[in-house]
């Protein structure tokens, strides 16, 4: 899959129901958010690999408004990169909670959210 830039490729994978991240062939280091070159090294040898879907909550906050509450979380993917997302099905969870990725559609576009382990 090579149509468009890395972000377009990532979104195309999500539309297929696949949570893909990049990995440097030379260092083995995983990369997220999708990029053309690896951070730190500038290597352009990034390949797409399936993410395990596992992560741990690093930080979480709850935004409250008249329309309701929604959390915003930072999770550390089991592969290493940190990702901004939200945790579905709960208002908040303790830091360190194990979560699992799920692809949902919102506003006509697929996105990755997480649910507490055991609720996946």
Give residue ranges: language-model regions.
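Short, conserved beta-turn/loop elements at beta-strand boundaries and strand-helix junctions
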Residues: 60-66, 106-107
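OB-fold/S1-family single-stranded nucleic acid-binding modules
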Residues: 104-120
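Short nucleic-acid-contacting surface segments enriched for D/E, G, S/T with interspersed K/R
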Residues: 89-101
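Beta-strand/loop nucleic-acid-binding surfaces
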Residues: 81-91
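Short, acidic/hydrophobic/Gly-rich beta-strand patch recurrent on exposed beta strands
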Residues: 72-78, 86, 113-115
